[in-house]
Amino acid sequence: MSKKGKKYIEAFSKVDKNKFYNIEDAILLLKEIKFAKFDETIDISINLNLKKNHTVRDTIVLPNQFMKPKRILVFAKGDRADEARAFGATHVGDDDLINKIKSGWDEFDVVVATPDMMKDVGRLGPILGKRGLMPNPKTQTVTNNLKDAINSLKKGRTEFRANKNGVISFSFGKSSMDNEKIKENYEEFVKEVVKKRPSDLKGAFIDSIYISSTMGPSIKVNFVWR
């Protein structure tokens, strides 16, 4: 474990690690112990009780956006390519973009593809997969409905998923945001995660929830969703 600085230790000392804070108090405390001089991102970590065969994965558009606009790349041909440009995609193409990405170009944040392009896009698996950007029907990034896909991405639609240890890590705000807006994003995100509870799971679905800022310690949050 890396050595923590004096300011982190001071902030850590103000957090009762045995206490479950309600979300309002957790947000207040998070801002009170903030010591970084930049606008920190606020993250949530949800520990789930999952079996090995369970998958928790989906996308969400939070009610209060805080991230910079995403650079949207669309793989499409012909009329579909024209549609993508009309709907505001940042980059649109087919083989030209595939070759460009193979050469090391990476100036994009999210990738969408029409179904007919996936055979060719699949050649980028080692590159896009490593960045978590391979188009997938489950995340609504393999589709012929480019209008809805692009519009929702422009509104901030973002993927979340549980890792192999059953932990979901997700950014849901900025420290400069109004407390109520941070709370709204928190509640919307947890609500969406709860909807992904596996139908055959017995017992509690959520084991624990923590929030933290970029540089700050974790704060355990009380929750009623199980």
From Swiss-Prot:
Any GO molecular function: tRNA binding
Family: Belongs to the universal ribosomal protein uL1 family.
Subunit description: Part of the 50S ribosomal subunit.
Keyword RNA-binding: yes
Key words, A-Z: Repressor, Ribonucleoprotein, Ribosomal protein, RNA-binding, rRNA-binding, Translation regulation, tRNA-binding
Function comment: Binds directly to 23S rRNA. The L1 stalk is quite mobile in the ribosome, and is involved in E site tRNA release. Protein L1 is also a translational repressor protein, it controls the translation of the L11 operon by binding to its mRNA.
Gene: rplA
Keyword Repressor: yes
GO cellular component term of the entry, any: large ribosomal subunit
Species per Swiss-Prot/TrEMBL record: Borreliella burgdorferi (strain ZS7) (Borrelia burgdorferi)
The protein's name: Large ribosomal subunit protein uL1
GO biological process terms held by the UniProt record: regulation of translation; translation
